[in-house]
Structures are given as C-alpha cells and as structure tokens.
Amino acid sequence: MTTTEKKDRRLEWGLVTLILVLLVLIVGFVTVMYRSNRPYAQAEEEATAIAKKYTDLTKVSDFYWFTRDETYFSLLGADKKGNEIAVIVPKDGNKVTVLNQKDGVSELAAMQNVAKAYPKEKVKQAKLGIYKEAPVWEVTTTSDSGKVNYVLVSFDKGEEIKKVSDI
C-alpha cells in the first residue's frame, strides 16, 4: 500500500468517524428535545380531553400553561357552532371555566395594553388563567436590565390587576 493510499484510507476513516459522531449528537439532541416537551404535550392532551368532555369544543387554536396561586391549562378554540371560546381547566380537572372570547379582551389586546402602560418594557407573551377566581391574562415582560415582570390583566375589562416586578 502506497503512502497516498494510506492517507486516503485515514481520510475515509476520519470522515466516517465524523459522520457517526454528528449522527449521535443529532439523535441525542432530538431525544432530549422530545423528552423535555413531553410534559407540555401531555398537559395539552389531557386539558383538551377534559374541555371536550364539558364543552362542544371542536378546534383548539392555542394552549396556555398558567401558574399563579394554582396551575391552570387554558385552551382557545371554537365550538360546534363556530363560536370562539376559551376553556380554563384547573390542574385537578375540577370546575372547568368556559368563556366566550368575544366577552373579554384578546391576548393581543392584553399585550397591547401592557405595552402602552409600560413602554420601556418588552412584552414577551401572554397566558390565560384564573387569579382570585377571575379570568386573567398574565402578560410577561422584560425590563432593560433583563429582569422579568408579570402583569395580570382582567379578561373581562382589560384592566391591570397586579404587577410582579423584577424577578
């Protein structure tokens, strides 16, 4: 075997090794991502099943995992008649709350209200849930210093209920 053939052979083995290492890394990454998202997906599946048991929900457009004093799973979607509804399911599955979306402020409106009230903060997301027995949007913002803030906005009127700052 000539020197050139030996170099070619080493190069081939190097490429095979590199491909195998990359393949193992990709499979590992996909496995970790799947396992980390599984609790969220399972909560969505269970909340959807409970919501369909208590309502005529046929289509789910959004899912929220909300935790304040208690944990709630909220679904936005449409019923059999095409009405836009929100279904809020407590973690224990009891006392499901059903809201007509038209009777309250939307996620976007809640986020816009917070952005207007706190122009120096960056609005990140909103989640629907229950706080002190009333439906609320929990709007998450960040300050210039990177601190996280939570603003609770009433679903009914879009008014600020509470702000938790600098977490």
Regions flagged by a language model, labelled:
Residues 27-30, 89-97:
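Acidic/histidine-rich, surface-exposed loop or edge segments in extracytoplasmic proteins
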Residues 9-11:
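N-terminal membrane topogenic signal
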Residues 51, 66-94, 108-167:
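Conserved histidines in hydrophobic membrane contexts and catalytic metal-binding motifs
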Residues 1-7:
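N-terminal Lys/Arg-rich, disordered targeting/topogenic segments
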Residues 30-63, 98-131:
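Short, non-transmembrane alpha-helical segments in secretory-pathway proteins
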